[in-house]
Amino acid sequence: MNQAQNSVGKSLDVQSFINQQPLSRYQWRVVLLCFLIVFLDGLDTAAMGFIAPALSQEWGIDRASLGPVMSAALIGMVFGALGSGPLADRFGRKGVLVGAVLVFGGFSLASAYATNVDQLLVLRFLTGLGLGAGMPNATTLLSEYTPERLKSLLVTSMFCGFNLGMAGGGFISAKMIPAYGWHSLLVIGGVLPLLLALVLMVWLPESARFLVVRNRGTDKIRKTLSPIAPQVVAEAGSFSVPEQKAVAARSVFAVIFSGTYGLGTMLLWLTYFMGLVIVYLLTSWLPTLMRDSGASMEQAAFIGALFQFGGVLSAVGVGWAMDRYNPHKVIGIFYLLAGVFAYAVGQSLGNITVLATLVLIAGMCVNGAQSAMPSLAARFYPTQGRATGVSWMLGIGRFGAILGAWSGATLLGLGWNFEQVLTALLVPAALATVGVIVKGLVSHADAT
């Protein structure tokens, strides 16, 4: 009998139980639902970058006027992420996730009917509240349903959904906007999440580890875990999470800022912040930079989509490598290469084929690294503070996204050209590399 398969009346260690079982259809369902949440999160997050050229032309506004609108959703994401983590650690992952999807779906749909910049700015901020809450809590829930041997692989695979959603926004906009206008992308990005929220209400389970830590009742925990291995769960008299003893009765903020976790938290924030500077400068402004350099609207949207699609190609490989090698070194290498290839993109404007290839590779590097960071954070923090730790990393990181979107508008306003803007990305790439490598050297905890 396996260690987790205790005799009747004995306590069942939830994580050991999950580790020892083959991945069930029930767990694959959690993977799929979290993937869909993150996919639609990515589609709505990237929407402004893709509709900006058409919106600017229709409303007769310059690029600088769109800077605050592009940043509005990112500011909302900060508040959504920072607020949702503590809520999920107190009340549960599922309810927060369903609410997040309803919020970003509803306000994305409303954004399609905005008639001026002020309306769009407010609606994009409100959309951002839901977007900011969705991703970290999907990461937390999925990480708590996955065995250690597959944790990084499955979480980074889920994050393929974010990059695929952003890329999908580019491909959809290339076809839909010329035919139906900029509103069409926002309508799609609003209706689909509202439909998904209905599915989540029925099919998404609560985290069993959360139920144990919060003492939500043996029968409820048993019902939640039974689909994985009914006989093993039926034999258990109670359920436990061993880490609970080490951090019990402490607030979530005391956990993530304690001596054990404090420095690691700061380094996670630095790394994710710098990575998002790169991602959002390119996501928000690469199509516009391409248009300014003579590319057609279709070419600009396609190359912008390639940047996101690169993350889809690399995320699974990064997760696989993290489960087998030093995860900090794996991520650090990808950030370093992101800076190198972003610089190369800036040197290749004259050849559209070479440019597209380099954009794809740059996207593979930086988006692959970014997709891996939530998995790294989820492995680092204990259950009591996991949602807060992951969501605060993503929330603080959003300031990097705001800086990236804002700096693109500022640099273009100062007259910087395509090559100069791309060269500047060497700085955040270097800082992200240093941040994650140093975290690997100083971390002494790997709470799972």
From Swiss-Prot:
GO terms for molecular function: carboxylic acid transmembrane transporter activity. The chain crosses the membrane at residues 31-51, 68-88, 95-115, 120-140, 153-173, 185-205, 262-282, 302-322, 330-350, 352-372, 399-419, 422-442. Changing residue 41 to A/N: Abolishes 4-HBA transport. It is found in: Cell inner membrane. Residues 52-67, 116-119, 174-184, 283-301, 351, 420-421 are periplasmic. Residues 1-30, 89-94, 141-152, 206-261, 323-329, 373-398, 443-448 are cytoplasmic. Its main location: membrane. Belongs to the major facilitator superfamily. Aromatic acid:H(+) symporter (AAHS) (TC 2.A.1.15) family. Transports 4-hydroxybenzoate (4-HBA) and protocatechuate across the membrane. Driven by the proton motive force. Also functions as a chemoreceptor, which is required for chemotaxis to aromatic acids. This is 4-hydroxybenzoate transporter PcaK. The lineage of its organism: Bacteria, Pseudomonadati, Pseudomonadota, Gammaproteobacteria, Pseudomonadales.
